[in-house]
A protein has these predicted regions:
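Conserved phosphate-binding elements of NTP-dependent enzyme cores
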Residues: 1-941
Length: 941
């Protein structure tokens, strides 16, 4: 086996025909500026080729389902192992996915609870014991003399198949009837079941009317049914068609409740035998939220206080006005009064209806006038009924804007049915155990006391649970609970969970490619992550990590610096070798920052703010412990703390959502807090995240920043366009008129290849230019609209230097370090860091009010230290204009440049949620209890 991976002639995206050697069984870090070509080399070339070769080895039938990977633009790659990509874009959005299910810990927990769990009665909580035939007979006879009963044996419960043999055996044994999926069949007829569906089948053993003289017959029938089904007896009570399940295995003597034998599926919320029947295992239900129906209580009903569809036009001539006028007359209130001044009785009637009491509705329509007497359903029952009845996705989506998720009333958000939640191990239900953090869950397993027999059964299961929980702790995720929904995890957390799962698999000879695993990780936990990566390497695997973290780069066996610039200025190998060799290379920008020759300077002075504060009182969302914090306005404030300490709960869930609801009229549900003071000093809140600026290839930096509107207006004002009668719309590639109709303005055509990947070829009519011939004949300074879209920001800045409006927007794009991107570049090809800087540039180009608060969550994700320097300059400019910038960040280069810090902790999860310290970076660095302060101290020397 070769000792290296050889990449020859890589040209994917902006890579300039580069050759790279990567040592096998080593930790290699690829670094470089944002947009320099790191991901193009690691993911789009090496990983894509590894995947393609694997998929190509499968049959054409299998390839049809997997989707064929396109061959990357590379001459050849030698020494390639099977490749596994662990990136940040694959976080599951499935509401059924949790930390426990993703890591497979939950599978072992289900097995443990099924094998050594102690069942209890879901009614009285008493421990359930096995039920005898005599007890079953006593309960059936208690139904009363004359009751008609069918005794059935449940032979198949929730299993796929046609089950032909079951019917044949029953027929051969002399039985006459069976019930399949609730339908009764005669065994003499042909019974056909769908092979791929799950079925329930019961054999009818006896049909009888309960009387004292049938006890012996009933006993024989129950014993026969139990023998057929392995201990289960189903009594079908007629004529109600009500089923009672009895079990020789487990039953409560006092309540007479039976439960089936404990199986792993009883503890799965993704299986109908375990899931709560009310919420089907989701743990939540969508309910109409009064706070979202009437978000602003200072507005009157007449002025549109109600935001719900169908009830938001009280001034109109519709039915809503009729109802509200009748309500105001009957309950003596004015439609002009602010909602907050209406009594609780009036609000209850408006929201929940008149409970059958009729109103006098007066109508005056073109077709006539008159009086109707009708009850008022109430806004909330009306919205809930319409939501259940509608078949329209559009209506459903509109109604969901007034709804919020709340815990299921039946299971209390625990996802499982009552019988499953009543089974305990060590005194805890499986749901209670999953509410524990990883570190507490490990302690519980270590201290668990089992009988000798239970220990023999559960020993191997407990070992697997401990191993998997240990892997989660080793990647710095000890604060997560196993019940945490996967959709709520950050990109870094999701990636580290997948990393922990891979360590658990103990594979050898695999090529792992990771994308910034240090994201969201405090400096304190970095050593744990590095130890995990080295452990994966020492198993005999090759690791390629795209990373900007200096500690990770120093710990690498081999370092590759891609650059020297970004976009068209990048795509070359600037330096490679050991970290020491890269540091010694004068051409490497990364090496200069690693060696300390270049660094981000600490500001000479810290801003004090404008004298006003935004204060959060009594924050209690997630793990926040009644927290009070104040943020000085007019400053650059950083919220720090270890992973899981409560930063996102405070900033994203409480501050952003509360300000968004009050200042921006957003329909959101803010996190729990007693009050937020100081809102009057702000006019709007803007969250600048790394989400894409558009999800279709038609979206680009020019359209997002509104540059394209100005460019189209400019082309429409040319003499040529005026002579032809072209307006600005003619120069849009999204509408008919100016665009090329052969490709609908896409510039390319998709050709489906079935067993091969779809091919995109340039449109033959417009040659990829998106516009028709007539539109392209209109020129400004010798360039067509298509030529302008192909320009980089730097080229456009020079081209439009005489036009102040265009020049200002282009200059801000250049100042945030995006001079290399093309104006018409598809937004889907931009990295998260690039998308975030496009948003920042858009905000910078707007006229500042000086009263805006900007919120950024880990803005340095995907950014090289040199990019971070540019980002900080932009953020400082926003603050210099009088605005407030609030940032969640772990990168010390950003933290040291802040005016004010809020350090949460001290630990993650239940050990966090308090304010450890606050103040300037120097004051936080002086705090011995602050983990952030300990690392910050070295940076401020």
């Amino acid at each position: 086996m070769p000792s290296k991976i050889f990449v020859k002639g890589a040209r994917e995206n902006n890579l300039k025909n580069i050759d790279v050697e990567i040592p096998r069984d080593a930790l290699t870090v690829i670094t470089g500026l944002s947009g320099s070509g790191k991901s193009s080399l690691a993911f789009d070339t090496i990983y894509a080729e590894g995947q393609r070769r694997y998929v190509e080895s499968l049959s054409s039938y299998a390839r049809m389902f997997l989707g064929q990977k396109e061959k990357p633009d590379v001459d050849y790659i030698e020494g390639l192992s099977p490749a596994i990509s662990i990136d940040q874009k694959t976080t599951s959005q499935n509401p059924r996915s949790t930390v426990g299910t993703v890591t497979e810990v939950y599978d072992y927990l289900r097995l443990l609870w099924a094998r050594v769990g102690t069942p209890h009665c879901p009614n009285c909580g008493k421990e359930i014991r096995q039920q005898s035939i005599d007890q079953i007979i006593d309960q059936l006879m208690a139904l009363g003399e004359g009751t008609r009963v069918q005794i059935m044996a449940p032979v198949i419960r929730g299993k796929k198949g046609e089950h032909v043999k079951i019917f044949e055996d029953a027929r051969r044994s002399g039985y006459v009837r069976v019930r399949a999926d609730g339908n009764m069949y005669d065994l003499s007829e042909e019974i056909s079941l769908e092979k791929n569906k799950k079925h329930n089948i019961e054999v009818v053993v006896d049909r009888l009317i309960l009387r004292p003289d049938v006890v012996h017959r009933l006993t024989d029938s129950c014993e026969t049914a139990a023998a057929l089904s392995g201990g289960l007896i189903l009594a079908n009570i007629l004529p109600d068609d009500r089923d009672i399940l009895f079990s020789q295995n487990y039953a409560c003597e006092d309540c007479g409740i039976s439960i089936e034998e404990l199986t792993p599926r009883m503890f799965s919320f993704n299986n109908p035998f375990g899931a709560c029947p009310t919420c089907t295992g989701l743990g939540t239900q969508l309910k109409v939220d009064p706070e979202l129906v009437i978000p602003n209580k200072s507005v009157s009903l007449l002025d549109g206080a109600i935001c719900a569809s169908g009830w938001n036009n009280v001034r109109g001539d519709g039915i809503s006005r009729m109802y509200f006028e009748a309500l105001s007359k009957k309950y003596h209130f004015s439609l002009r009064d602010p909602v907050e001044k209406l009594s609780k009785e009036v609000m209850d009637v408006i929201l929940y209806g008149t409970k059958g009491e009729k109103l006098e509705l007066q109508y005056d329509q073109p077709r006539g006038k008159g009086v109707l007497y009708q009850a008022f359903e109430g806004i909330i029952p009306n919205l809930e009924r319409r939501y259940k009845e509608t078949q329209s996705d559009g209506v459903r989506e509109e109604l969901e804007s007034c709804m919020s998720e709340c815990p299921c009333p039946a299971c209390g958000g625990k996802r499982l049915r009552r019988e499953s939640l009543a089974v305990t191990v060590g005194g805890l239900s499986i749901s209670d155990y999953c509410e524990k953090s990883v570190v507490d869950a490990l302690d519980f397993v270590d201290q668990l006391t089992l009988t000798e027999q239970q220990m023999r059964i559960g020993e191997r299961i407990l070992k697997e649970i401990k191993n998997r929980l240990g892997f989660l702790r080793s990647v710095g995720l000890e604060y997560l609970t196993l019940s945490r929904a996967s959709a709520t995890l950050s990109g870094g957390e999701a990636q580290r969970i997948r990393l922990a799962t891979q360590i658990g698999s103990s594979l050898m000879g695999v090529l792992y490619i990771l994308d910034e695993p240090s994201i969201g990780l405090h400096q304190r936990d970095n050593d744990k992550l590095l130890a995990t990566l080295k452990r994966l390497r020492d198993l005999g695997n090759t690791l390629i990590v795209v990373e900007h973290d200096e500690d990770t780069m120093r710990a690498a066996d081999y370092l590759i610096d891609i650059g020297p610039g970004a976009g068209a200025h990048g795509g070359q190998v600037v330096a490679c070798g050991t970290p020491a060799e890269v540091m010694a290379n004068p051409n490497s920008l990364t090496g200069q920052y690693l060696s300390g020759k270049k660094k981000i300077e600490v500001p000479k002075e810290r801003r004090k703010g404008n004298g006003n504060f935004l204060t959060v009182r009594g924050a209690q969302e997630n793990n926040l412990k009644n927290l009070d914090v104040s943020i000085p306005l007019g400053t650059f404030t950083c919220v720090t703390g270890v992973s899981g300490s409560g930063k996102s709960s405070l900033v994203n869930e409480i501050i952003y959502k509360k300000l968004g609801a009050d200042l921006n009229r957003m329909k959101v549900h803010p996190g729990r807090c007693k009050a937020i003071e100081g809102e009057e000093f702000l006019d709007k809140v803007i969250c600048i995240d790394q989400s894409p600026i558009g999800r279709t290839p038609r979206s680009n930096p020019a359209t997002y920043t509104n540059l394209f509107n100005d460019i189209r207006d400019l082309f429409a004002s040319t003499p040529d366009a005026k002579a032809r009668g072209y307006a600005a719309g003619r120069f849009s590639f999204n509408v008919r008129g100016g665009r090329c109709e052969a490709c609908s303005g896409d510039g390319q055509l998709k050709i489906e290849m079935h067993f091969l990947p779809d091919i995109y070829v340039p449109c033959e009519v417009c040659k990829g230019k998106r516009y028709n011939r007539e539109t392209l004949e209109v020129h400004y300074k010798g360039k067509s609209i298509a030529d302008v879209l192909e320009m980089t920001v730097e080229e456009a800045l020079e081209f439009f230097r005489d036009l102040p409006k265009l020049e200002a927007k282009l200059r801000t794009l250049s100042e945030v370090g995006l001079g290399y991107i093309r104006l018409g570049q598809s937004s889907t090809t931009l990295s998260g860091g690039e998308a975030q800087r496009v948003k920042l540039a858009t905000e910078l180009s707007k006229r500042s009010t000086g009263r805006t608060i900007y919120i950024l969550d880990e803005p340095t994700t995907g950014l090289h230290t040199d990019d971070v320097k540019k980002l900080l300059e932009v953020l400082q400019r926003l603050v210099d204009a009088g605005n407030t910038v609030l940032v969640i960040e772990h990168k010390l280069d950003v933290i040291k440049c802040a005016d004010y810090l809020l350090d949460l902790g001290p630990e993650g999860g239940s050990g966090g949620g308090t304010l450890v310290t606050c103040g300037t970076p120097e004051e936080v660095a002086a705090c011995e209890q602050s983990y952030t302060g300990q690392y910050l101290r070295k940076m401020l020397r």
